[in-house]
């Protein structure tokens, strides 16, 4: 089941302390907003509309660099007006229903929460994740003694909250009771049926300065590191240059293959695909397809990186080993590292390129071909 998303990111977040609004702050190396955008795209969102301020629009291209399937619109003076602006900005193409409204200050959206919401809409007009209240509640009016409040039947509402677009538009149009605290309140007032699904303790809202310290810890819980490895080999043939790790090297032979035979890029592509469970390079670029005859292998690697991004993941580091008697790799190693960093969009200090020989043993030792191995670490949503 497909869906679309409106992420409300137009607030000032003053309770979170001085400095940038909380949705633009960096959490475990990435902007708070990016966490939820990546999660929704990885779960299959047809489109994500980010509702922001005029100042925020300047941040978005940098904050969401490399992500496809999102766009922005300007919000209003209140959350309700911003939600309505986001609903108006959604396309009406197939796959845009239902709509999930989400607060940008809740970075840890899980696939399980999203799927539960989609399933609950078959019997409700709006579904939202919620947690049962576990703490004892106290009420203390000004100047009076504290009183215990029963927590029976009380739930803590979270976002995203899911409903059909026309349901939300009609409910907001009919709302006349001031500023609502969430979308469920608006739909409920319009006579809609509300369903609660299992909430997630990780789906905490960043409101106060101390919340960010806890979120830094939770970020490690909400992400997993996956490792992939790849291997490739090509035989030598007549030629005047060889491509290795995206760099052309003058040589008295070339590597023979269907594409440009860049064994370094092929091994690295396979390692990335392996880390995210997406098969191997032959599945995506079959050697039987004439389209890829003589193709530059950097496009294969970029495709693998795009798949990582689409899953809400990020490359941590890569390590490539070239196995050959010649050409000498050391004079070109830094250029290879820089080219790989450029293709992968990661800092060069996260890229390693090494070379070794097999001491004259085997096909590489006899000078019949060159081999490459690669290992990568990829961070993805848990």
Curated annotation (Swiss-Prot):
Lineage, uppermost ranks: Bacteria, Pseudomonadati, Pseudomonadota, Alphaproteobacteria, Caulobacterales
Keywords: Isoprene biosynthesis, Lyase, Metal-binding, Multifunctional enzyme, Nucleotidyltransferase, Transferase
Cofactor dependency: a divalent metal cation
InterPro entries: IspD, IspD/F, IspD/TarI, ISPD_synthase_CS, MECDP_synthase, MECDP_synthase_CS, MECDP_synthase_sf, Nucleotide-diphossugar_trans
Enzyme Commission number, as recorded: 2.7.7.60, 4.6.1.12
Site location (Positions MEP for the nucleophilic attack): 151, 205
Catalytic activity annotation: 2-C-methyl-D-erythritol 4-phosphate + CTP + H(+) = 4-CDP-2-C-methyl-D-erythritol + diphosphate; 4-CDP-2-C-methyl-D-erythritol 2-phosphate = 2-C-methyl-D-erythritol 2,4-cyclic diphosphate + CMP
Function in brief: Bifunctional enzyme that catalyzes the formation of 4-diphosphocytidyl-2-C-methyl-D-erythritol from CTP and 2-C-methyl-D-erythritol 4-phosphate (MEP) (IspD), and catalyzes the conversion of 4-diphosphocytidyl-2-C-methyl-D-erythritol 2-phosphate (CDP-ME2P) to 2-C-methyl-D-erythritol 2,4-cyclodiphosphate (ME-CPP) with a corresponding release of cytidine 5-monophosphate (CMP) (IspF).
Residue numbers binding a divalent metal cation: 232, 234, 266
Keyword Glycoprotein: no
The keyword Oxidoreductase belongs to this UniProt entry's keyword annotation: no
2-C-methyl-D-erythritol 2,4-cyclodiphosphate synthase, as annotated region: 226-382
Any GO BP: terpenoid biosynthetic process
Name of the protein: Bifunctional enzyme IspD/IspF
Residues that bind 4-CDP-2-C-methyl-D-erythritol 2-phosphate: 232-234, 258-259, 280-282, 356-359, 363, 366
GO molecular function: 2-C-methyl-D-erythritol 2,4-cyclodiphosphate synthase activity; 2-C-methyl-D-erythritol 4-phosphate cytidylyltransferase activity; metal ion binding
Entry similarity comment: In the N-terminal section; belongs to the IspD/TarI cytidylyltransferase family. IspD subfamily. In the C-terminal section; belongs to the IspF family.
Coiled-coil segments: none
Positions bearing the site annotation: Transition state stabilizer: 15, 22, 258, 357
Region (2-C-methyl-D-erythritol 4-phosphate cytidylyltransferase): 1-225
Species, as recorded: Caulobacter vibrioides (strain NA1000 / CB15N) (Caulobacter crescentus)
The gene coding this protein: ispDF
């Amino acid at each position: 089941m497909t869906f679309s998303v409106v992420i409300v990111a137009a607030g000032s977040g003053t309770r979170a302390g001085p400095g940038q609004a909380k949705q633009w702050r960096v959490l475990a190396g990435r902007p708070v907003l990016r966490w939820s955008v990546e999660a929704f795209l990885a779960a299959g969102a047809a489109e994500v509309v980010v509702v922001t301020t005029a100042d925020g629009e300047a941040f978005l291209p940098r904050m969401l660099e490399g992500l496809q399937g999102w766009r922005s619109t300007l919000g209003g003076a209140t959350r309700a007006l911003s939600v309505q602006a986001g609903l108006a900005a959604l396309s009406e193409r197939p796959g845009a229903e239902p709509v999930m409204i989400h607060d940008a200050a809740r970075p840890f959206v899980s696939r399980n929460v999203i799927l539960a919401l989609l399933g609950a809409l078959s019997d409700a007009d709006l579904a939202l994740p919620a947690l049962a209240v576990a703490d004892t509640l106290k009420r203390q009016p000004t100047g009076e003694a504290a009183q215990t409040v029963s927590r029976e039947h009380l739930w803590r509402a979270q976002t995203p909250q899911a409903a059909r677009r026309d349901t939300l538009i009609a409910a907001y149009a009919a709302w006349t009771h001031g500023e609502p605290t969430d979308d469920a309140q608006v739909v409920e007032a319009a006579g809609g049926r509300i369903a609660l699904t299992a909430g997630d303790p990780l789906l905490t809202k960043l409101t106060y300065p101390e919340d960010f310290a806890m979120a830094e810890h939770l970020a490690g819980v909400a992400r997993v590191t996956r490792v992939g490895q790849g291997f490739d080999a090509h035989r030598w043939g007549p030629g005047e240059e060889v491509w290795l790790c995206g760099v052309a090297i003058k040589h008295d032979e070339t590597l023979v293959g269907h594409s440009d035979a860049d064994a370094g890029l092929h091994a690295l592509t396979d390692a990335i695909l392996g880390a995210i469970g997406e098969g191997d390079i032959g599945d995506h670029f079959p050697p039987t397809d004439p389209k890829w005859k003589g193709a530059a292998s950097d496009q294969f690697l970029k495709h693998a990186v795009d798949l990582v991004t689409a899953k809400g993941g990020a490359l941590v580091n890569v390590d490539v080993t070239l196995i050959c008697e010649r050409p000498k790799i050391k004079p070109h190693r830094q250029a290879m590292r820089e080219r790989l960093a450029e293709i992968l969009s990661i800092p060069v200090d996260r890229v390693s390129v090494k070379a070794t020989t097999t001491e004259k043993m085997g096909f590489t030792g006899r000078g019949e071909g060159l081999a490459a191995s690669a290992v990568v670490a990829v961070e993805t949503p848990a």
